[in-house]
């Protein structure tokens, strides 16, 4: 990494800011870990947890990637709908760049866009899964982001309680809850 930095014109590293969309425990730990890792190759990163208003101003309102102030940004996402579309389209479809949605990498890939659009238009579950896999494979190859962490959801309860489930978006469902 130091060699690549030197080749890019930064033989002594550089200073930057690492923005976090959150200030909760996991985000703080991940940001500090990134800060430590970057320091090992000469990049001094100052961590700044953005308040909601700052996030909108500095990240989510920036239409032009050339003038957007974003450089390093830690953000998390879960598909609140449980659908693959909401896991990919708002973050990685070309049409989803700020201020419309959350493609803060300003990522553009025609194959990804076509696969996501095709998946939206079909009702065939197998075809939909195939298209989302194609999109994910392209995204993985391009690496528009560094995918860092997948949080594990943990839920414990009394043996007398059943029917309470943790959903993919970290919410709970109580519709089938039963206390014996």
Where are these regions (language model features)?
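Short helix-initiation/N-cap motifs at beta->coil->alpha
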Residues: 22-23, 47-60
């Amino acid at each position: 990494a130091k060699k690549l930095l030197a080749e890019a014109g930064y033989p002594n590293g550089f200073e930057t800011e690492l923005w976090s969309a959150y200030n909760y425990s996991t985000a703080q730990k991940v940001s500090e870990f990134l800060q430590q890792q970057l320091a090992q190759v000469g990049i001094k990163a100052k961590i700044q947890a953005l308040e909601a208003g700052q996030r909108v101003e500095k990240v989510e309102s920036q239409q032009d990637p050339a003038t957007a102030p974003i450089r390093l940004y830690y953000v998390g996402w879960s598909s609140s709908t449980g659908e693959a579309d909401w896991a990919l389209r708002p973050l990685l479809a070309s049409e989803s760049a700020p201020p419309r949605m959350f493609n803060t990498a300003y990522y553009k890939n025609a194959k990804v866009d076509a696969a996501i659009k095709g998946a939206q238009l079909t009702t065939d579950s197998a075809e939909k899964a195939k298209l989302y896999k194609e999109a994910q494979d392209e995204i993985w190859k391009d690496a528009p982001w560094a995918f860092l962490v997948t949080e594990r959801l943990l839920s414990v309860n009394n043996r007398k309680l059943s029917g309470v489930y943790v959903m993919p978006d970290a919410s709970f469902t109580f519709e089938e809850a039963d206390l014996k």
